[in-house]
């Protein structure tokens, strides 16, 4: 496979990862989910719910919940664990996502690539689970199958991006749960919202520019906020894309796309 180069990254010259991701999000169906994946997903959801409860009274969550309540806005989703206060979906995602990572107890994706630091990639559950919860509320509810499909769609997108990207991403100081988690949240929200075609492509481009989190903030309140912001930004990208907001439709690909800029490139072998 030919390699397209810039000074900082090596990426496949003819990759179509953005298109593949958009197609996967649009075409994924509940009936196609393997039973083993559903069993794992149920465990992840239960674990995530426990993490939300555990993180509700953590100082970082309490401060964020108070700020979200003060800012108010359209009451789309509950600030879970904080009474009956309802706030915009993106604000609820920020608070809930942060509570899920407040104690750093959430599950981990283990890499098949020994080059990845500690053999770990990301904490994959909380961003797509949070996006699924808040958007289900914002859109008036979802069936159990719709909810699980959205969650697993986001989970799969997040884990694939984490595995395919070079390990330089984490070594350069990015916190992958905050960065790559944004894609998981976007995919989950977009699936529940029924986004299709170019709205998915633009949404992935938006997500690529919103994905953030740096490791110097480990040990502070801001580390769990990375995951809260991943959930918030993924939801925001989906909502903006639904309205027709535009971005580069191949933002995961190319010499200046997400993989190149934040990860130094992508493994061509893993794409084959």
Q: What are these language model-derived features?
A:
Residues 2-272:
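N-terminal core-entry segment
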């Amino acid at each position: 496979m030919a390699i397209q180069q810039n000074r900082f990254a090596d990426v496949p010259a003819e990759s179509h990862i953005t298109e593949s991701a958009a197609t996967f999000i649009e075409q994924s169906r509940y009936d196609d989910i393997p039973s083993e994946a559903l069993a794992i997903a149920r465990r992840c959801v239960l674990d995530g719910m426990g993490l939300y409860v555990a993180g509700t009274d953590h100082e970082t969550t309490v401060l964020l919940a108070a700020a979200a309540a003060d800012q108010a806005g359209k009451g789309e989703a509950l600030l879970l664990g904080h009474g009956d206060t309802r706030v915009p979906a993106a604000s609820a995602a920020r608070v809930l996502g942060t509570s899920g990572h407040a104690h750093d107890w959430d599950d981990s994706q283990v890499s098949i690539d020994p080059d990845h630091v500690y053999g770990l990639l990301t904490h994959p559950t909380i961003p797509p689970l949070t996006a699924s919860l808040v958007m289900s509320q914002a859109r008036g509810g979802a069936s159990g199958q719709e909810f699980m499909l959205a969650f697993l769609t986001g989970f799969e997108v997040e884990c694939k991006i984490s595995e395919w990207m070079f390990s330089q991403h984490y070594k350069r100081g990015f916190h992958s749960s905050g960065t790559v988690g944004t894609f998981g949240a976007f995919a989950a929200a977009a699936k529940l919202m029924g986004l299709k075609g170019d709205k998915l492509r633009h949404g992935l481009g938006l997500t690529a520019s919103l994905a953030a989190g740096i490791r110097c903030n480990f040990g502070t309140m801001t580390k769990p906020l990375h995951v809260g912001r991943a959930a918030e930004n993924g939801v925001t990208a989906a909502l903006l894309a639904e309205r027709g907001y535009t971005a580069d439709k191949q933002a995961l690909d190319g010499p200046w796309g997400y993989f190149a800029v934040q990860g130094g490139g992508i493994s061509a072998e893993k794409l084959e």
